[in-house]
Amino acid sequence: MASRYDALIIGAGHNGLVCAAYLARAGRRVLVLERDDIVGGAARTQEVFPGFSFSVFSYVVSLLRPEIIRDLDLPRHGLHILPLDSTVTPLPNGDYLGQWGDHDQNRRELARHSLRDAEAYDDFGLLMHQMARAVKPLLAMTPPDPAARSPRHLMGLAKLGSYFRGLGRERFHVLHKLLTMSSADYLDEWFETEALKATKSASGIIGTFLGPRSPGTAYVLLHHYMGEIDGVFRAWGFAKGGNGSVSAAIAAAAREAAPRSAPVHRWRKCSLQTAAHAVSCSKTAKKSGRVWSFPAPIRGAPSCGSWAPRTCPAIS
């Protein structure tokens, strides 16, 4: 393994692997450091019981940006997504609420619980679809610094303001509600059935440490309407082989793009030194112009201590 790289990435979660793949495609020499035996971070597949493997953290696919799938050609590297067609919410009285991909079947199921909710559901879905389409481009923007006076940040603020102005008064009002309200309060404005509101509220708290009554969770609900699979908006699916296959495909793309790099190596401990220009691993310092840490930035420069380098079997 070389001692000098253009970039060191600490943490082989799916975000770190995507970063490594794009840097490698740009011709950079990249080293990814991972302390675990398995790459992928929360997007992993593990054998929990002998002979049975599971997606132990992240369990569905939808918010993986389609341009990443295209750029890295992930299907060629083994990514295959199976559509998620239906879900079911069991109820305390022994009944259930089903959610189906088929429009008519879904409407009949909702009408079984509430005719009013069945009538409102299409309008709700259309509005959420429109708002998700309107907001999704912002996710690809680098947010400007409102306190900066540089032309780049001032232009960014002007562009952002123009974008919101272009939404129009009505949609901007809806966006304001989605950004500030709780998912429970927002759903109360649309539906009467507790089973339906509870089912939808779950999408407002996924990935948070909040409850459905927490302000801002209405946006999390909206965010989960931004998913896309094979050009189908608001589609969700399961990765064949578990969500670890998503990370494995990204790692394979990074490895293919980086013949001069060492895509992923396993290390128990690393020490950041000299203003993020070197990371000590094992007995040798790996010099780098840039250091990225996933999921959190490294602070300080602790002493090296003892080192135990091992190549990650999931990649090498």
Predicted regions and their residues:
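Active-site/ligand-binding neighborhood in enzyme catalytic cores
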Residues: 129-257
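Flexible loop/turn segments at secondary-structure boundaries
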Residues: 38-42, 206-209, 269-271, 300-304
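Short loop/edge segments at beta-strand edges and connector loops
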Residues: 83, 263-265
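Glycine-rich loop(s) and the adjacent beta-strand/alpha-helix scaffold that form part
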Residues: 236-257, 265, 270-273, 281, ...
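Short helix-loop-beta connector
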Residues: 1-4, 273
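A short, glycine/Asx- and small/polar-enriched loop/turn
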Residues: 93-95, 211-215, 271-278
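Conserved acidic residues
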Residues: 6, 278, 291
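N-terminal glycine-rich phosphate/pyrophosphate-binding loop and immediately adjacent elements
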Residues: 3-147
